A protein has these predicted regions:
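A short, conserved structural fragment
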Residues: 76-88
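Short, conserved alpha-helical segments within structured domains
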Residues: 7, 25-28, 52, 64-68
């Protein structure tokens, strides 16, 4: 985990705090982005203890759905996360075909 970028650590910590471990507890990148932008105690996660408060705030402010998806794809390639086949999910009244992800 030490080799991960601070941004990847934020995304991993969000998955962990949401309880997205194992295929029965998967979540979408949209839910992760919402969790990151709305959760005040995310910085208290053990993985983020060494990230300075200013760096943490900068990371949170720069996060968007594209960056979250890119970071999740990187975590999947490293074998840390797992993705599902796309499923049809309604988000904000719009039906989308999305993958769900979870920590292995």
């Amino acid at each position: 985990m030490e080799t991960l970028s601070d941004k990847a650590k934020v995304v991993y910590a969000a998955f962990d705090m949401m309880g997205a471990r194992g295929s029965e507890n998967k979540t979408t990148s949209y839910a992760i982005l919402d969790f990151i932008s709305e959760t005040e105690d995310l910085q208290d996660h053990d993985l983020l203890k060494e990230v300075s408060e200013q760096d943490f705030v900068d990371i949170i402010m720069d996060m968007n759905i594209k960056s979250v998806n890119t970071l999740i794809a990187s975590l999947c390639r490293k074998g840390i996360m797992e993705k599902t086949e796309p499923v049809s999910i309604k988000i904000d009244g719009v039906r989308r075909s999305l993958r769900q992800y979870f920590i292995k």
